[in-house]
Amino acid sequence: MRAPDFWWRDPPSLPARLLAPVGALYGAAAARRMARPGAPAPCPVVCVGNVTLGGAGKTPTALALAALLRELGARPAFLSRGYGGSLPGPLRVDPAAHGAAEVGDEPLLIARAAPTIVARDRPAGAAACAAAGADVIVMDDGLQNPSLRKDWSLAVFDAGVGIGNGLPFPAGPLRAPLGAQWPLVSAVLVIGDAAQGRPLLAAAAARGLPALRGRLAPDAAAAAALRGRPVLAFAGIGRPDKFFESLRAVGAELRGTRAFPDHHAYRAGEIAALEREATRRGLTLVTTEKDRVRLPAAMAVAVLPVRLALAPDDAALLRARLAALLRGRAGP
């Protein structure tokens, strides 16, 4: 689905106020569900999540955490629900054998970096991670899922939108009332403009939570290849506008944009229309890494990957927290 604009307007607009009673019921049900005790995992669980629906930068953050854990000598594996995929799991993702329709787009992307297990049953998925040789699990999303006990949870925020109008779905973007979500959070990561992120950093500090700052940095080689090139950009992610702005920032000549819903399954007709327009106008098609795995392998399309870049002090703090976690829990 595509997030409605009124989610991000504060104070809440008329559509949000009309939906607020439904949001209150949804939020109360979510809060009750989140209060259930989780099953223990066979090794430490690091959860990367967010308090809102939509894109915040969780996948680049999960990849960065796995890289840090490897530097610390750990053997991380990713655990994902496999949103958008048809296979319930638990199964290990093989990018050469599985498609996004089977396991979801995010698992295909992160499986290039570390063993990745897709499982709707999170405790069963955690057992599969351990069987695959992992001694620490990076749970991609799942902050609100109570089925598996987490040892450390990082809540990722987009500084540009924050918590929107502060209301639960469908009146706003919150997955549950904030009061029910804060106790689940071990640390906060705010991605984007530092000035816009100050209220979030202050809210974390008021709760005694470590608050990290980061940005999504485009891959240097891909950025150089796109600089000065006329492009037709398309994306089916939580906030396509962020991707389009990244292209402008690296110097691509943005001649057209096409936004699709998050996790969009591209149809043959849509792909053909994009290719025809790009050919007719002499443009290069460009999309995100996450969209690329949902497209035919033979399709000619450029990609602008991004990675999480942290302020040096925050990178050191994150490394120290992960090292302490590994020292403090070596088993179930």
UniProtKB/Swiss-Prot annotation:
Annotated residues for binding of ATP: 52-59
Signal peptide annotation: none
Record-linked Pfam families: LpxK
GO MF annotations in UniProt: ATP binding; tetraacyldisaccharide 4'-kinase activity
Keywords: ATP-binding, Kinase, Lipid A biosynthesis, Lipid biosynthesis, Lipid metabolism, Nucleotide-binding, Transferase
Annotated EC: 2.7.1.130
EC top class named in words: transferase
GO cellular component: plasma membrane
Catalytic reaction annotation: a lipid A disaccharide + ATP = a lipid IVA + ADP + H(+)
Highest rank taxon of the organism: Bacteria
Segments passing through the bilayer: none
Pathways per UniProt: Glycolipid biosynthesis; lipid IV(A) biosynthesis; lipid IV(A) from (3R)-3-hydroxytetradecanoyl-[acyl-carrier-protein] and UDP-N-acetyl-alpha-D-glucosamine: step 6/6
GO BP: lipid A biosynthetic process; lipopolysaccharide core region biosynthetic process
Family per record: Belongs to the LpxK family.
Task performed by this protein: Transfers the gamma-phosphate of ATP to the 4'-position of a tetraacyldisaccharide 1-phosphate intermediate (termed DS-1-P) to form tetraacyldisaccharide 1,4'-bis-phosphate (lipid IVA).
NCBIfam families linked to this entry: lpxK
Name this protein carries in UniProt: Tetraacyldisaccharide 4'-kinase
Species of provenance: Methylobacterium sp. (strain 4-46)
Upper lineage: Bacteria, Pseudomonadati, Pseudomonadota, Alphaproteobacteria, Hyphomicrobiales
